[in-house]
Swiss-Prot record:
UniProt name for this protein: Sperm flagellar protein 1
Gene name as annotated: SPEF1
InterPro entries reported in the protein's UniProt record: CH_2 (IPR010441), CH_dom (IPR001715), CH_dom_sf (IPR036872), Spermatogenesis_Ciliary_MAP (IPR052111)
GO MF term list: actin binding; microtubule binding
PANTHER family documented for this protein: SPERM FLAGELLAR PROTEIN 1, SPERMATOGENESIS-ASSOCIATED 4-RELATED
Role this protein plays: Microtubule-associated protein involved in the stabilization of microtubules along the axis of migration during radial intercalation. Promotes the establishment and stabilization of an axis of microtubules required for the active migration of cells into the outer epithelium. Microtubule-associated protein that promotes microtubule bundling and stabilizes microtubules against depolymerization in response to cold shock.
């Protein structure tokens, strides 16, 4: 499948991945990214509050890999107006060579685009609106069952529209964006969400600290047990 992506695009992708600090070494993209965990880490690197890493379990089993990808698709990629079809998720989970690259390349574009819009100071209402007129971007390897594909103009795989945009009355979004009370409500909701996320992060840190203490205690118990066994053998 990697044949549908030009060498320069792959080279740029590998350089990009190498510059992102991840929890485990990157030796083989098809295998390393197959469980979705590193993809979640990549997104978290750009938008830390968008991803909760405890939801993604490093896995070798196909079932757990698909579970990770399904959760990532539903809870995170959807916020980026991006989606990975089930058949593609399965191929990635099975470590099919060259498939994950066809997802990572457009995902990188979407992440950098959103980051650029944030730096330019575009408001949250505009951020939530897809720029291409669709509800989300769909990335695939085949054109069957979902209609004809739309080739990426840069030759980096295939991008396909997953569904038609929801029709909206003309001027409706502009009226909402200019309504001070609506903007205030959005700002308040965003503050509440941030406060909730911070609380969750504090609790997660406490849980990790307790898990670390428990691990240290287990190591200490094993060490004492080993010494006790050695002492008993010497007495015999």
């Amino acid at each position: 499948m990697a044949g549908s992506v030009d060498e320069e695009a792959l080279h740029q992708l590998y350089l990009w991945v190498d510059n992102i600090p991840l929890s485990r070494p990157k030796r083989n993209l098809s295998r390393d990214f197959s469980d979705g965990v590193l993809v979640a880490e990549v997104i978290k690197f750009y938008f830390p509050k968008m991803v909760e890493m405890h939801n993604y379990v490093p896995a070798n089993s196909l079932q757990q890999k698909l579970s990770n990808w399904s959760h990532l698709n539903r809870k995170v990629l959807n916020k980026l107006n991006f989606s990975v079809p089930e058949d593609v998720m399965r191929k990635i989970a099975q470590c099919a060579p060259g498939v994950v690259e066809l997802v990572l390349i457009p995902l990188r574009q979407r992440l950098e685009e959103r980051q650029r819009r944030r730096k330019q100071g575009i408001g949250s209402l505009q951020e939530l609106a897809p720029q291409d007129g669709t509800d989300y971007m769909d990335v695939g390897l085949s054109q069957k069952a979902r209609g004809e594909g739309v080739p990426d103009p840069q030759g980096r795989g295939q991008l396909r529209e997953g569904r038609l945009p929801v029709p909206r009355p003309p001027g409706d979004s502009q009226a909402l964006q200019s309504d001070p009370s609506f903007i205030l409500q959005i700002a308040e909701k965003e503050q509440e969400l941030l406060a909730s996320q911070e609380t969750v992060q504090v609790l997660q840190m406490k849980v990790r600290r307790l898990e670390h203490l428990l691990q240290l205690k287990n190591v200490r118990i094993e060490d004492l047990s080993r010494r006790l066994q050695q002492a008993e053998r010497k007495q015999r």
